[in-house]
Amino acid sequence: MAAREGRAPLARRAAIYGVVGLAAIAGVAMWSGAGPHRGTGAAGDAPDAAAVGGVAAAAPQAAVPASAGLPPSLAGSSAPRLPLDAGGHLAKSRAVRDFFDYCLTARSDLSAAALDALVVREIAAQLDGTVAQVEALDVWHRYRAYLDALATLRDAGAVDKSDLGALQLALDQRASIAYRTLGDWSQPFFGAEQWRQRYDLARLKITQDRSLTDAQKAERLAALQQQMPADERAAQQRVDRQRAAIDQIAQLQKSGATPDAMRAQLTQTLGPEAAARVAQMQQDDASWQSRYADYAAQRAQIESAGLSPQDRDAQIAALRQRVFTKPGEAVRAASLDRGAGSAH
């Protein structure tokens, strides 16, 4: 079972880690509230994960060493850097949300008060004694108010993804809550995401309109695409290319292609650099599977040793730190442990 716990198909991991640029979310994603975070990287998933298609952002780069007091879900990781403007104030950037989303990865491990304390410590580690520290704390309180407001929605804001009217209402509700709680921070936090969701919803409305002929649909979709900013069009083209690459990787795996054959095929369609990244990912994946299987066996021994929950959790956390030394690996292992229904 241990090996299966750590395994993820290479095509899916290609999407997660961005083999060929931006990762694509195919189709319509689940509309969810602010639930616990689970992810393969240090940043995890954003709490406002609702999206009608779109592009998944890459995990932010770690900026400062992790403190010794991190909860198990963040063990072995470091917080993303909080950006500052030229005047030393907190920059109005999506990176600020990424910082808070990193901290929210520990939500399942901590009480609300302990989570607040964690955020206060992580902010102080970067901004202690600065005006930006006060600003970051204020934005955190606003963000918490946003998440709390989402949680009050019916079914925490979850809707039937086939009901376009409900999707439209959910978008409007979230935008209203974001503006009410975050104020001028709502745009850097959610502006690009909301625009993308509305664009994708408009596409769905066109494609599902039975009163239109195929030619009319194509005409309206083309007109809609022309409304897309140039940078968004370029991003969409990259998404389309990556989606095709992911499909190709899945087909090659399904056909039992050897690593050399897969690399040769991908070199023809993606180029040598992307093919080399896939090959490296295959090697990294094999290494991960082996180390996770060994770790899971040792973890099972600890779990069966009759220790108190506190001692058991401490020993497993220490084991993760010894086995998984690269950034984000211990977080990934802890996430897989929770998903497997083990100690965490």
UniProtKB/Swiss-Prot annotation:
GO terms, molecular function: unfolded protein binding
Recorded GO cellular component terms are: plasma membrane
Q: Does the keyword DNA-binding apply?
A: no
Record key words, sorted: Cell inner membrane, Cell membrane, Chaperone, Lipid degradation, Lipid metabolism, Membrane, Transmembrane, Transmembrane helix
| TM annotation in the entry | 14-34
Q: How does it sit in the membrane?
A: Single-pass membrane protein
Which Pfam families does UniProt cross-reference here? Lipase_chap
Q: Where is it predominantly found?
A: membrane
Q: Repressor: present as a keyword of the record? A: no
| UniProt-annotated location(s) | Cell inner membrane
GO annotation, biological process = lipid catabolic process; protein folding
Taxonomically, which superkingdom? Answer: Bacteria
SUPFAM superfamilies (UniProt xref): Lipase chaperone-like (SSF158855)
- Name the family the entry cites: Belongs to the lipase chaperone family.
Please give the function described in this protein's UniProt entry. May be involved in the folding of the extracellular lipase during its passage through the periplasm.
Name listed for the protein in its UniProt record = Lipase chaperone
Traced from the root, the source organism's taxonomic lineage reads: Bacteria, Pseudomonadati, Pseudomonadota, Betaproteobacteria, Burkholderiales
The gene that this protein is the product of is: lifO
